[in-house]
Amino acid sequence: MRIKTTTKTEYQQRINVLVEYINNHLGEDIDLNKLAEISGFSRWHFHRIFAEFLGEPVGTFIVRMRVETAARLLRYTEIPVKEIAYKVGYDVPSSLSKVFRQFYGISPNEYRNNKDYVIMEPNRKCPIWN
């Protein structure tokens, strides 16, 4: 997709606002219509621009942010896994465990108990603002 420089900067600012909103509301249901509204884009344009700038669909981004946040909480706090699941937006702790294992190949408890285990982020397109 080819975007003019001024438009690209404006879009980048809108995406930054969305990323901040998502990170501040991980423990809540994140409504995609609300995100489109916050961005000022139509729902269709919002999905397209978000994926173009961040290299992944918005739903995938939200799940990844939830799992990465859970990993940090597991590593650096003593908060129980059940409570972490709720903090990052899962109604059922087993849902976090399932997604965590899909992303990292290890359960949240195994990750917490093995301090030598390092999670490597999957290869993905770097955000434009970096």
List the predicted regions and their residue ranges.
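Short, charge-enriched, intrinsically disordered boundary segments that mark the beginning
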Residues: M1-Q13
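Short amphipathic recognition helices of helix-turn-helix/homeodomain-type DNA-binding modules
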Residues: K98, R112-D116
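Short coil turns linking two alpha-helices in DNA-binding domains
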Residues: S42-R43, D91-V92
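Core residues of bacterial helix-turn-helix
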Residues: S39, V88-G89
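Terminal helix-turn-helix DNA-binding modules in bacterial transcription factors
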Residues: I3, N16-N33, E52-V88, K115-N130
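Short hydrophobic/aromatic patch on the recognition helix
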Residues: F46, F50, S95-L96, F100
